[in-house]
UniProtKB/Swiss-Prot annotation:
Molecular function, one GO term: actin monomer binding
Signal peptide feature range: none
Role summary: Binds to actin and affects the structure of the cytoskeleton. At high concentrations, profilin prevents the polymerization of actin, whereas it enhances it at low concentrations. By binding to PIP2, it inhibits the formation of IP3 and DG.
Organism: Glycine max
Subunit composition and interactions: Occurs in many kinds of cells as a complex with monomeric actin in a 1:1 ratio.
Keywords: Actin-binding, Allergen, Cytoplasm, Cytoskeleton
One GO cellular component term: cell cortex
Domain of life: Eukaryota
Name of the encoding gene: PRO1
Family stated for the protein in its record: Belongs to the profilin family.
Alphabetized Pfam families for the sequence: Profilin
Subcellular localization: Cytoplasm, Cytoskeleton
PROSITE patterns for this protein: PROFILIN (PS00414)
Name of protein: Profilin-1
Amino acid sequence: MSWQAYVDDHLLCDIEGNHLTHAAIIGQDGSVWAQSTDFPQFKPEEITAIMNDFNEPGSLAPTGLYLGGTKYMVIQGEPGAVIRGKKGPGGVTVKKTGAALIIGIYDEPMTPGQCNMVVERPGDYLIDQGY
């Protein structure tokens, strides 16, 4: 299965009538493996900051998580594995695998829990597969 099919079929899937607004799988170096249409154009330093938070959990909390210039307030995640952010009625979940970052961005009516499930479950699978 191609990475684009993974984004289209697994990350943008329908959950109780809701789905992610944007999704992407990117390398930990910031290279895009696959992304949804109109995924925010992120800056290399934003990915560097995300990777730094995985290596030093809590480093994003004072400044916020930026993705495509949008600031998200960092909320409780799983240190070294998952970063979660909130902005108004929506938010973002970033799951780290061995080689990639899986990113899901959502808005209401999707819930944070639905976003977490959609992003983290495939992430766990990719970890099991060596990615």
